[in-house]
Amino acid sequence: FIPSLETFGKNRTFNHDTLFKRLRELSFLNSGLSIILKDERDGRSSNFKSDGGLQEFVTFLNKKKSVINKPFRFLRETRDGMAVELALQWNDSYQENTLCYTNNIFQKDGGSHLSGFKTALTRSLNNFMEKEGYLKSGDLTPSGEDVREGLTAVISVKLPDPKFSSQTKDKLVSSEIKPVVEQETYKHLNDFLLENPGEAKQIATKIIDASRAREAARKAREMTRRK
């Protein structure tokens, strides 16, 4: 593109690395889209195309981590123009990394799509672990934080008229997408767990270990305060 002098000014400069990362991100968010970045200042050129979409995105984010399950991904389009795509994978770390997008725009503060995802994720996994007997007598029900420990996830929604909390679009507030994300995540994740018992066991074990560690830490704090 040719930048506008009126918008960018005479002393405009473009950071190659910033453009590289954003175009790579867009290729993950739009499966099959081919993007070429050519920097005529130094001759650098990069081609971006992801046939795997969000599944490849999650694999990329976890490339330096030891993963627990194969990437889980689904895409659901509704009759009223909304679409939900999600991919997730657990690794053996203790940090959560969940990225949220609306119409290819990143929301650093999440919003209604993230809220629906978290609710469905916790409910689906706790119901599964209870039904399959992973939770033993005396075990506390794992919290949302326990469930998301070591989770890498990407949520991408498409909305015809999205609403955000501010002009920077850092948080999605469109309430109509929350039940769609929640319903579809619960359904597809439950199917994945039932169809992949080996990986489901690995995920359940990590979550229960996180829950027990949290409870042990709480009891240790209480003992310290009593002394």
Where are these regions (language model features)?
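GHKL-family ATPase ATP-binding module
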Residues: 1-227
